[in-house]
Amino acid sequence: MQKVMNDPEDLGNCKICLQRADGIHFAVSSCRACAAFFRRTVILKLNYTCKEKGNCTVEKSLRNLCRSCRYTRCINEGMKIELVQLQRDSIGRKKSGASISIDPLFTPNVASSLSAIFKNEKEDVLSTSCTILSQMTSGYAMFLNIRRSTNTLVQSSVITPTFKMPKIELHASRFDSAKQVCKAEAHLVTDIVNSYFSPFNSLKFEDKVALFKNFFCYFSHTDRAYQSFKQFESDNLNDKILMPDGGFIKRTELGRFYENAEGVHTSAEDAAKIFQPALNYILDVIVDYMRRIHIIETEYLALLGFCLWDDAVPGLSKEAKSLAVQTQSKLLAELQNFYSSQNKDAVEITQRVGVLLLLVPKLTKCVIMLRENSVLAELFNYYEADVCCKNFKEDASVDLDCTSQCIVHTKND
């Protein structure tokens, strides 16, 4: 008599990896991890190559070693590609209590998929009458949502359709996971800037590359400082800085960040010595200054706008320089209007703008320090920088050896 598969206890083992199955996924009794792997492979159209002869063992403890054989097993056991398509198209119509399993082996392409979903949700909200700052606010909110999602993808295998993450206790960050998320973050930021940091999208490709390469270094380190300030605002003795992977680095334990990391070729202590001064500077100068002036998000985004629209960036066309100057003026005007709406008088507005802009040279010094530290670390082969991070060096040419399509990795056809 054929077994009825309605009771989870009657599902038996996963047909793919042989661990306990928890449901019928894509017409096959399987576990969430294998279902998520199959879904991700199909949606992102990933191709795998077996390094052996196509007969690798696929079981719970070894299922991640050969993705080619794992995917082949999925197909051979009867998983249906067309069912993945149907489920993907109905993401927005699922009940908020449901969950989608995502394979934790995260790639930047997943970030692009998440970005597309969020963008579709936001497009109806934005209108052509939005100011530069309000568009940036919407884009930054979407960026934070996606980044929380990418952190969860790296740390676990479950994500809700609405991408509202449960509160997770802070954990000590590690080099490998931070590098993984940072690589994805670079692609996310290109998409956010291109879509929401008006009028960036109107620039020629070469001008986009020049401005973005300069901007991303500012954004990456400034956002760590800003998020650290927000997280530990009331703690004047805070000695931790938040990292892109959702974890933190403690000032006195920087060496732990580099322990047992695949891309680090020296001792954790030696790697820490290279970057300790920059970490101290971020905490003692930038985060401390943000705390003293009680910076708010609108001011922070205006600051990012000034860093992006730098007309002194080498290689800009005349048109781009002119647009940068115009956008700077518009940002200043919008910032003044914002302060006026907060009932500040002319003197208070002038003082506040001055206090805010005094942060820019501090950010510039931090960027210079970190660039010099990175060059030194690579010179002595202390660690391996991924291809995306290498592209953001001041004197680096654009390296197109990247699987994702973003501003700094796409040729101008």
From Swiss-Prot:
Which biological process annotations from GO are given for this protein? intracellular zinc ion homeostasis; positive regulation of transcription by RNA polymerase II
The free-text function statement in the UniProt record for this protein reads:
Nuclear receptor transcription factor that binds to DNA enhancer elements to promote the transcription of genes required to maintain micronutrient homeostasis. Direct binding to its ligand zinc allows for nuclear accumulation and activation, which thereby induces the transcription of genes required to promote the storage and detoxification of excess dietary zinc. This in turn, allows for internal zinc levels to be detected and regulated.
Source gene?
Answer: hizr-1
Q: What outcome is documented for mutating D270N in this protein?
A: In am285; gain of function. The mutant protein accumulates in nucleus and increases transcription of zinc-activated genes in the absence of excess dietary zinc
Q: What is expression of this protein induced or repressed by?
A: Induced by high levels of zinc.
Organism for this UniProt entry: Caenorhabditis elegans
The UniProt entry, under Pfam families, shows: Hormone_recep, zf-C4
Q: Where is this site: Required for DNA binding?
A: G23, S30, R63
Q: In which tissues is it expressed?
A: Weakly expressed in intestinal cells in the absence of zinc supplementation. Upon zinc supplementation, accumulates in alimentary tract cells, and it is mainly expressed in the intestine.
Mutant phenotype after disruption: In the presence of excess dietary zinc, reduced transcription of genes such as cdf-2, ttm-1b and mtl-1, which are required for zinc homeostasis, and retarded growth as compared to wild-type.
Q: Which keywords appear in this protein's UniProt record, sorted alphabetically?
A: Cytoplasm, DNA-binding, Metal-binding, Nucleus, Receptor, Transcription, Transcription regulation, Zinc, Zinc-finger
Q: Which GO terms describe its molecular function?
A: cis-regulatory region sequence-specific DNA binding; DNA-binding transcription factor activity; RNA polymerase II cis-regulatory region sequence-specific DNA binding; zinc ion binding
Which residues mediate DNA binding here? 11-86
ZnF (NR C4-type) intervals:
14-34, 50-69
Compartments in which it is found: Nucleus; Cytoplasm
State the name under which the record lists this protein.
High zinc activated nuclear receptor protein
Instruction: List membrane-spanning regions.
Output: none
Q: Locate the region Required for zinc-binding.
A: 101-412
Residues forming the NR LBD domain are 135-396
PANTHER family of this UniProt entry? HIGH ZINC ACTIVATED NUCLEAR RECEPTOR PROTEIN (PTHR46011:SF6), NUCLEAR HORMONE RECEPTOR FAMILY MEMBER NHR-86-RELATED (PTHR46011)
Q: Name one GO cellular component term.
A: cytoplasm
Q: Which family does it belong to?
A: Belongs to the nuclear hormone receptor family.
Q: Principal localization?
A: nucleus
- InterPro entries named in the record: HNF4-like_DBD, NHR-like_dom_sf, Nucl_hrmn_rcpt_lig-bd, Znf_hrmn_rcpt, Znf_NHR/GATA
